[in-house]
């Protein structure tokens, strides 16, 4: 008996592309609906992305959490990203979850982002950061220039469609990635300092 073909899923959340953005954060694919604590990127309450942002910009890991709820405040997050000029865009538009979970290891990519079309909407964007290895691999494939895979925390030149961009590979904020919250926040802080979006700590 043949097994049923695995479902091709479409990314449920659109990119957030502030026209004045100077930085774009790019990940892969969100968890299934039952693991989402809000309707926006990095929605799993066990994922530390928005705790990292809270620490970096407000010195408060709970800044983007809903009071007394195990959920993040999507509208507060979006307003902050728009105000600071930070875009959030997936590298993957369609994919198959080979094991039915959010693991990049078992994510079969069907369709990737049209990076040129995305960047065309943000003429001032100069810095791209990825939130894990898979997103980094996808962007290097799209760029097609033989750039060596950067190590976690490393920044490399990323020339694309006539623009001199940088690409920084940041650690995954998934709890499955073996790095504590403070060290993840330090890596993201270093990136945002480099991009001029937060002041260096003395």
Language-model features, listed with the residues they occupy:
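C-terminal capping/extension of enzyme domains
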Residues: 1-15, 19, 31-36, 43-45, ...
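N-terminal nucleotide-binding beta1-loop-alpha1 segment
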Residues: 25-28
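Active-site catalytic pocket residues across diverse enzymes, especially alpha/beta-hydrolases
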Residues: 57, 142-143
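Internal catalytic-core helix/loop-beta-alpha segment
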Residues: 83-142
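Amphipathic alpha-helical segments that form well-ordered structural scaffolds
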Residues: 52-56, 135-138, 190, 194
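Short, surface-exposed acidic-centric catalytic microdomains
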Residues: 34, 38-107
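Structural motif
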Residues: 22-23, 127
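Short, conserved, surface-exposed binding loops centered on an aromatic residue
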Residues: 16, 78-81, 121
